[in-house]
Regions:
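Fe(II)/2-oxoglutarate
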Residues: 1-24, 210-226
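Catalytic core of non-heme Fe(II) oxygenases with the double-stranded beta-helix
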Residues: 73-89, 93-214
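Short linear sequence motifs
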Residues: 9, 19-22, 62-63, 167, ...
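Non-heme Fe(II)/2-oxoglutarate
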Residues: 8, 16-100
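A generic alpha-helix propensity feature with a strong bias for hydrophobic helices
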Residues: 39, 50, 168, 217-220
Length: 226
C-alpha cells in the first residue's frame, strides 16, 4: 500500500530534524531516511525510461525535452508522486523547512524533477541562485556502485572540495546563494543514477508545466509544528 501524504510528511520532518549540518564552503545539510521505504520503492519502479544523452551533458537544460517531473499529470497517474508532492506542499512542512534551514518559502512554487542520470552525465559547477529559493537533492538508486555518485561541492573559485554521500533515501540540502557551487564531476555511472531534484522556485519560473501545483503557491503554517 502506498504511504499517505501524512506519512511522507512525517518521514520528511524526522529527516529534517536529524540533518547533519556542514558550513564549509557554504552552509549545507546531509539527511538520511527521508521518505518511507515503500515510497522510495514505488518511485524506483515508475515506468519512466532514462533518456539517451546523445554524447551531450554539462547542464540539465540541454535535455529539457526528455526530462520528467512530478507535475500535474504524473501526480494524477502515480500515487507516490502525489503523496510526495502533497507532503512538500503542506504548509506545516514548509514552516519547518523555513525554521530549520533559514529560508523563506511563502509564495514559492514546488518543482520536483525525477532525474535519471546515465553514463556520460556530468554537471558543471553552478549555484542555483536566481529563481530557485531552496534545493533538496534526494538520492534514490540502490546500486552499491553508486556510493561515489553524490553531489560535488566547490568553493568560490569552483575548486572541488568535497562530495556528498550517496545512499538510497539520503539527501543534500542547501539554500542557493552566490557561493553554493555544486555539480557532478564526470565519472562512471553503472545503470541509472536515480534521484529527485526538489526545488521551491519563485513566481518568475517560466516553465509552469514543470510545477507540481502551477496555480497554487506555497503557504506557510503559523505556528510551525515539531
Amino acid at each position: 500500500m502506498s504511504a499517505s501524504a501524512k506519512e511522507v510528511a512525517a518521514s520528511l520532518l524526522r529527516s529534517f530534524h536529524t540533518a547533519a549540518e556542514g558550513r564549509s564552503p557554504y552552509r549545507h545539510w546531509f539527511l538520511r531516511d527521508c521518505l518511507p521505504q515503500s515510497t522510495v520503492d514505488e518511485i524506483l519502479s515508475l515506468p519512466i525510461s532514462a533518456a539517451d544523452l546523445g554524447g551531450v551533458s554539462g547542464k540539465r537544460e540541454l535535455h529539457n525535452a526528455s526530462r520528467h517531473y512530478f507535475d500535474v499529470a504524473n501526480r494524477a497517474e502515480h500515487a507516490c508522486a502525489e503523496s510526495v508532492s502533497s507532503a512538500l506542499q503542506d504548509p506545516r512542512v514548509a514552516a519547518e523547512i523555513e525554521r530549520i534551514f533559514g529560508v523563506k518559502l511563502g509564495g514559492t512554487y514546488l518543482r520536483i524533477e525525477f532525474a535519471q542520470d546515465v553514463d556520460g552525465f556530468w554537471l558543471e559547477p553552478h549555484t542555483d541562485i536566481g529563481v530557485k529559493a531552496f534545493t533538496f537533492l534526494l538520492y534514490l538508486s540502490t546500486d552499491p556502485t553508486h556510493a561515489d555518485l553524490g553531489t560535488d561541492i566547490y568553493d568560490n573559485d569552483k575548486k572541488w572540495v568535497g562530495r556528498s554521500p550517496f545512499a538510497s533515501n539520503s539527501a543534500m540540502i542547501f539554500v542557493p546563494s552566490n557561493t553554493s557551487y555544486h555539480g557532478f564531476e564526470p565519472r562512471k555511472i553503472n545503470g541509472v543514477r536515480k534521484s529527485l531534484v526538489i526545488n521551491y522556485v519563485t513566481n518568475e519560473w517560466r516553465a509552469r508545466e514543470q510545477l507540481s501545483y502551477p496555480e497554487q503557491p506555497v503557504t506557510v503554517a503559523e505556528p510551525a509544528f515539531a
